[in-house]
């Protein structure tokens, strides 16, 4: 008696090939969630995230985004326990990653930027504290916008797996938990094995 039929083996092999190709990408996958551990802290900036765009269409160029990033990067770093509003960032003497990311989010969103996410995660795999930045997906790819560290936008696919590791993201009223493609593939592999065992 054979423990596995050839059909089951081929299904498992095909599933592994498909899932391994998904796990080759460094970009995270975002899973919609009803809440995040940061929701209470985000109260002050919720109006920025939830505001509608004044622009009828996307009117944001990479040159303009890089200009805004440079302006925000030139603001001295100063940690704040609470999330500063964009107005507080623009008028204050210093701002941290949270304030700078939210200020850039507001500038871009007001000009109609789409596929824009405020991300909370780790700057590097060895980071002990969390960091905030934006991710912006356009036809040319996904860009990491970090006005605390960088003067210009960076293509996400050129950063590798050891930097800008997302944990949670906000896009308007939507909230997400990040799942790496490897974890996504692993969970779907387990689900695929359950299906294959039922054949």
Give each language-model segment a name.
Residues 4, 23-199:
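A structural boundary/capping signal
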Residues 2-12:
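Bacterial N-terminal signal peptides that target proteins for export
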Residues 12-21:
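Bacterial N-terminal signal peptides
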């Amino acid at each position: 008696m054979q423990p596995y039929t050839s059909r089951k083996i081929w299904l498992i092999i095909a599933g592994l090939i498909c899932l391994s190709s998904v796990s080759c990408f460094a970009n995270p996958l975002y899973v919609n969630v009803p809440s995040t551990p940061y929701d209470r802290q985000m109260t002050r900036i919720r109006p920025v995230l939830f505001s509608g765009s004044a622009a009828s269409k996307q009117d944001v160029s990479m040159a303009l985004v890089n200009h805004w990033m440079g302006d925000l990067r030139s603001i001295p770093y100063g940690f704040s326990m609470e999330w500063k509003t964009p107005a507080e960032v623009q008028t204050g003497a210093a701002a941290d990653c949270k304030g700078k990311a939210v200020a850039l989010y507001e500038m871009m969103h007001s000009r109609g930027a789409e596929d824009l996410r405020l991300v909370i995660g780790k700057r590097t795999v060895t980071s002990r504290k969390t960091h905030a930045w934006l991710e912006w997906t356009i036809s040319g790819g996904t860009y990491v916008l970090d006005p605390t560290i960088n003067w210009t936008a960076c293509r996400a696919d050129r950063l590798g797996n050891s930097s800008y590791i997302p944990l949670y993201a906000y896009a308007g009223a939507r909230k997400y938990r990040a799942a790496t493609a490897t974890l996504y593939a692993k969970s779907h592999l387990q689900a695929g094995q359950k299906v294959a065992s039922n054949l």
